[in-house]
Amino acid sequence: MNPLIFKEDCPLDLIAVGRLCVDLNANETQRPMEATRTFTKYVGGSPANIAIGATRLGLQTGFIGKVSDDQMGRFITRYLQDNNINTDQICIDRTGAVTGLAFTEIKSPEDCSILMYRDNVADLNLDPTEVSEDYIKQSKALLISGTALAKSPSREAVFLALEYARKHDVVVFFDVDYRPYTWQSEAETAVYYNLAAEKSDVIIGTREEFDMMEKLLNYEESNDQVTAERWFSHHAKIVVIKHGGDGSIAYTRDGQSHRGGIFKTKVLKTFGAGDSYASAFIYGLMQGLEIPQAMRLGGASASIVISKHSCSDAMPTRAEISAFMEIAEEIV
């Protein structure tokens, strides 16, 4: 059963809010970053990747965010426009803030890392006054990402967007997206992540991310069922807990759980899997699919993206996912 009810006759299916950055992915693999000489530039940031993926699958998508007033900011905005994402609510920073950069290192499929430059970034300067209630109420769903909660004024802008979404019956997806380098402490992170999760209809995160959110509760051990049930006393209708190569489990308020598997593929790198999973999972739910079907789409999309060099450029179409699912071995 799909417990989500989406409004009808909205010009937008999904609005994402938060991080817009640039990924610089290593062209030379099987070597450390110190020995890497060339990189390829892509648009990045978890909410950006998810919005791009959802659009490529057929959703009408918009974005609320802030970019730097320079070549990188213009590159991001133009890329989103070229990929049919509404950019009416992307603001330009006038304070001299810069675009966040993510350099990737691909030593092996199992050994990948990211070097982030996140000082004085434009996306965290998004102000509450730049969040339009009218824009949000025109959408069926809102996607928020945890990184946007790391600092003010972006933090307050996200919470205002959440309030507008709740007011206008907009379904809220929360992609936890925990990046330690943007936070002062795990305690600070847990406080704001918990506040956001309480207002969300669907929460998607890894087991490790949920463990971080539960730091303040002093649980003796991780328990997926206990984690999910905690959020059902608030707004949550679906809680998805991801376990990497072991797949994922989706819990619903009526006590059901659904296990999602993975599809075998030739892995190039590990990053991008979560964003591609989320985009296809959200798409499936918004198309009225049952949760297990939406999870299969997410798993297939993730396997496609980790086999390719980029994240945003590699986001698949519905036809590409269908073709992949016909030939790939599924492990549940």
From Swiss-Prot:
Pathway: Polyol metabolism; myo-inositol degradation into acetyl-CoA; acetyl-CoA from myo-inositol: step 5/7. GO terms for molecular function: 5-dehydro-2-deoxygluconokinase activity; ATP binding. InterPro entries: Carboh/pur_kinase_PfkB_CS, DKG_kinase_firmi, Myo_inos_IolC, Myo_inos_IolC-like_sf, PfkB_Carbo_kinase, PfkB_dom, Ribokinase-like. It comes from the Bacteria. It is an enzyme of class 2 (transferase). PROSITE patterns: PFKB_KINASES_2. One of its GO terms (biological process) is inositol catabolic process. Its EC number is 2.7.1.92. Pfam families: PfkB (PF00294). It catalyses: 5-dehydro-2-deoxy-D-gluconate + ATP = 6-phospho-5-dehydro-2-deoxy-D-gluconate + ADP + H(+). Keywords: ATP-binding, Kinase, Nucleotide-binding, Plasmid, Transferase. Catalyzes the phosphorylation of 5-dehydro-2-deoxy-D-gluconate (2-deoxy-5-keto-D-gluconate or DKG) to 6-phospho-5-dehydro-2-deoxy-D-gluconate (DKGP). PANTHER family: 5-DEHYDRO-2-DEOXYGLUCONOKINASE, HEXOKINASE FAMILY MEMBER. NCBIfam families: myo_inos_iolC_N. Belongs to the carbohydrate kinase PfkB family. This is 5-dehydro-2-deoxygluconokinase 2. The lineage of its organism: Bacteria, Bacillati, Bacillota, Bacilli, Bacillales.
